[in-house]
Amino acid sequence: MANSTAELEELLMQRSLTDPQLQAAAAAAADFRILPDATVIKIGGQSVIDRGRAAVYPLVDEIVAARKNHKLLIGTGAGTRARHLYSIAAGLGLPAGVLAQLGSSVADQNAAMLGQLLAKHGIPVVGGAGLSAVPLSLAEVNAVVFSGMPPYKLWMRPAAEGVIPPYRTDAGCFLLAEQFGCKQMIFVKDEDGLYTANPKTSKDATFIPRISVDEMKAKGLHDSILEFPVLDLLQSAQHVREVQVVNGLVPGNLTRALAGEHVGTIITAS
């Protein structure tokens, strides 16, 4: 196994990138977190932003207050408008990559709206090449807003079935948290967390405060509260090994979760 940068470089020059020894050497390389003190918050599109002023304004107030003590990367979901676009595009026979572009445009719109509400506090909206300015914005105002859709667009990996993009805004926000090495990932939804069934339609649904990815899959809950690819991403992540899902419609929940409290459902990698 390589014990130095020089040895790792030698392996990179000599071996296939899938070579087991090279893979082991790369895995043993020193780990580095870019933004270890930051938290990524994903604001749901359909669950929060689509509800309008009544849901969004209280969250804006919480975010403004929370950024005094926390560094926040605030990602936006797409929501109902994206679902409408998906239905039209799928009916036209268009592929997942095109649907991903359409969904991204809606998440962008939501980021723009949230950004305008936070503009007077100096909190910017960043995206694309602008993500390189995130550390500066966090240093100055402790928060940024970004569109949650990952930028795969036409390069979106096809779903196993159908043409709905499998990696959407939940995945995009999680991937940003993982790549930046953030300390926490919070999904802000319109439910208290994960249930044994859909609480909107089943009166027998039972709340689950904590669960692992494997337990979710075993119970058939892997495509319920989060996009199912997020669970696989969580299991393969190095830095973010658990996420919390909270009800953003309850005042104070986000603030408590940022402070490290167990507010909703915590989903663990193992």
Curated annotation (Swiss-Prot):
Q: Which UniProt keywords apply?
A: Cytoplasm, Metal-binding, Molybdenum, Storage protein
Any single Gene Ontology cellular-component annotation: cytoplasm
Transmembrane domains' residue ranges: none
Q: Name one GO molecular function term.
A: nutrient reservoir activity
Principal localisation? cytoplasm
Q: Which Pfam families match?
A: AA_kinase
Q: Which Gene3D superfamilies match?
A: Acetylglutamate kinase-like (3.40.1160.10)
Q: What induces it?
A: Requires molybdenum.
InterPro entries to which the protein is assigned, alphabetical: AceGlu_kinase-like_sf, Asp/Glu/Uridylate_kinase, MoSto_subunit_alpha/beta
Where does the record place it?
Cytoplasm
Q: How does activity depend on pH?
A: Optimum pH is 6.5 to 7.0. Above pH 7.1 molybdenum is released.
SUPFAM superfamilies from the entry?
Carbamate kinase-like (SSF53633)
Briefly state the protein's biological role. Intracellular storage of molybdenum. Binds polyoxomolybdates. Can bind at least 90 molybdenum atoms per protein molecule.
Per UniProt, subunit arrangement is: Octamer consisting of 4 alpha and 4 beta chains.
Question: What family does this belong to?
Answer: Belongs to the UMP kinase family. Highly divergent.
Indicate what this protein is called per its UniProt record: Molybdenum storage protein subunit beta
Q: Which organism is it from?
A: Azotobacter vinelandii (strain DJ / ATCC BAA-1303)
Upper taxonomic classification of the species?
Answer: Bacteria, Pseudomonadati, Pseudomonadota, Gammaproteobacteria, Pseudomonadales
